[in-house]
């Protein structure tokens, strides 16, 4: 059996997230359907994570198994040919047989985009606010995140997860061409975690919460303490890293 990694991107606007579910079309479902058509046999793909409904991905990965050696260049071209225009396959590559798209990922990176101006061309990808935020305070809050590992407070209730421990290696706010961008990198993320963190930091940027309040929310390990979240449409999964050993020479 041969294992292959798929590198892809998608606009999440028309999908109920990544993972297959009974009530709605998902990205995983679309790719599996098209891949199964091309290979003329049912194929199951395993993603590196589960983005929520409306969340986009500049880079997502998934793996699948196939008995024969595939022409990955040809398969990539053919798959792009029948997938809808809001899903793009960058490449398909062979990997080691025990490589896993989800469990072997070293890190994942997300970005959230905020604007203060009307933008008719990017309304679906930017969260618009009326007044500029205090990025100095928000970056102060960002620096605090790496001091903690239990992010229960930012996890959606009733999430099916064994642990709420995440190791955040980067969190910062930057402004590029008038757009505020929050970048966060960690070994893993909880459901709704990034959107909850951003929503709470916006409250800090509006002087509705203090840095002390932010610490209290984290240390409470209680989702009830959380007051704010942000819409999914401005959130992007932008990178996933893997150890070199999973790739074939």
Swiss-Prot record:
EC numbers for this chain: 5.4.99.12
Species whose genome carries this gene: Azobacteroides pseudotrichonymphae genomovar. CFP2
Subunit description: Homodimer.
Protein name: tRNA pseudouridine synthase A
Keyword line: Isomerase, tRNA processing
Catalytic activity of the protein: uridine(38/39/40) in tRNA = pseudouridine(38/39/40) in tRNA
Superkingdom, natural source: Bacteria
Molecular function as annotated in GO: RNA binding; tRNA pseudouridine(38-40) synthase activity
Active site: 52 (nucleophile)
Record carries keyword Membrane: no
Segments forming a coiled coil: none
InterPro entries, per database record: PsdUridine_synth_cat_dom_sf, PsdUridine_synth_TruA, PsdUridine_synth_TruA_a/b_dom, PsdUridine_synth_TruA_C, TruA/RsuA/RluB/E/F_N
Gene Ontology BP annotations: tRNA pseudouridine synthesis
